[in-house]
Amino acid sequence: MEEIRSARGRYTLYGTSACHLCELAQEMLQQLAQVAPGFVYSAVDISDSEELFQRYGLRIPVLTDQRGRELDWPFTPDQLWAFYRS
């Protein structure tokens, strides 16, 4: 997994390539990146890891930060912004 940093730390979006909700979450993250300079994230396909699949399989998409906080779907742009700002 490629490590990416922002001014507020590292973010990871867990999902799968066949997940429509994950695509919606990625669109929201891309919109956030346009208004929050320095915000970047990495997307991880949980189907590549049994451990990640067991942890996130029924909850994807899930966004995590370097502090271990998790934002589960469904989330709104406002909730995403609040997660980023806190």
Predicted regions and their residues:
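Non-catalytic, surface beta->alpha helical segment in thiol-disulfide oxidoreductase systems
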Residues: 65-86
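Short glycine-biased active-site loop of nucleotidyltransferases that positions the nucleotide triphosphate
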Residues: 53-55
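Local sequence-structure signature of Cys/Sec-based thiol-disulfide redox active-site neighborhoods
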Residues: 2-35
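Structural micro-motif
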Residues: 57-63
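Residue-level recognition of oxygen-bearing side chains
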Residues: 24, 51, 76
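Thiol-based oxidoreductase modules, predominantly thioredoxin-like and allied folds used
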Residues: 38-50
